[in-house]
């Protein structure tokens, strides 16, 4: 009888421990954590009603704790629902966090962190070479050879610093989506306009006929938060679903931060929903496995190459890199008109996002596009990095 009681106590303790959510810690030493801000992810299968009940309960707990202890925490900030992957972002005191972790409906919690663009501005007069390179097996051509469908009927979401949707390079194909970064819908940085011009600009872009949606998740200094990125991804999936374009959409994320399971899960859900997702590998010349969303297995992770088919000195590398694309000295549009030159894996990723849209426009399934691009790619990159592919983006033009 004593043994049975002991066993019962042990099993009860084990069940309680098993019910507690995991608090995930990001492993990259350079991660910039945002104090008292957390991303909470619910377990698969939690219904909408149970999710709303949990949200209401947390709001009540936070309100009580705030009144009792006089904290300056702000409570619930954003909710996420990406194809039934549910969660939220909030600013909570430690006691409220403990209550959240003890809820059996919660899968895991991670601290929010700073996310930044993956681009570096360089001289403004450098020549454009990326388009010619991705349409020829051999380096050196300035001609861009492509199918004239050029992404027609496909929508690309630019998740970035915003986009100057009135720039002449977009010819009326760009529209505003949402802003999770600040209250200013303009692209004050220029990064988002440049990347959009690269994936779908009339003069500088790969998919010259694709539609463009501005999703602003980074501010004028090029930084944002993981929670803001997830909110932007959430918008993209819901917008594509409402417009009936899942399967005819792509997304570019020329940004990154330390490893984040929530960020990786969000982009994975978007990819699985029918949106081709291209992401920058990062600019620290390190293993991209330590970065998000670059480390998400489901997305197409892009490293940067030079005009000489070498790895760009800044580019991250590693086994999670799917493909290389031009990223050094890339000329494209700037806000207000005209063009400028930037370098970074931020410039490489939109080449792949645009090429994904190009392939989707010709009938490819977004879920299979990255594999198709890797099959087409040219084995051209010298010194690609340890355990890293040497495959360079190619559009299959036959040139």
UniProtKB/Swiss-Prot annotation:
GO molecular function annotation: serine-type endopeptidase activity
Cystine crosslinks: none
Residues of the Peptidase S8 domain: 128-399
GO cellular component: extracellular region
Protease in keyword set: yes
SUPFAM superfamilies listed in its UniProt record: Protease propeptides/inhibitors, Subtilisin-like
Propeptide feature ranges: 20-118
Signal peptide extent: 1-19
Keyword hit for GTP-binding: no
Keywords: Glycoprotein, Hydrolase, Protease, Secreted, Serine protease, Signal, Virulence, Zymogen
Glycosylation: residue positions: 102, 252, 308, 395
Domain Inhibitor I9: 38-117
Protein origin, superkingdom: Eukaryota
Location within or outside the cell: Secreted
InterPro entries for the chain: PCSK9_ProteinaseK-like, Peptidase_S8/S53_dom, Peptidase_S8/S53_dom_sf, Peptidase_S8_Ser-AS, Peptidase_S8_subtilisin-like, Peptidase_S8_subtilisin-rel, S8pro/Inhibitor_I9, S8pro/Inhibitor_I9_sf
Active site: 160 (charge relay system), 191 (charge relay system), 346 (charge relay system)
E.C. code: 3.4.21.-
Family under the similarity heading: Belongs to the peptidase S8 family.
Function: Secreted subtilisin-like serine protease with keratinolytic activity that contributes to pathogenicity.
Protein name: Subtilisin-like protease 4
Lineage: Eukaryota, Fungi, Dikarya, Ascomycota, Pezizomycotina
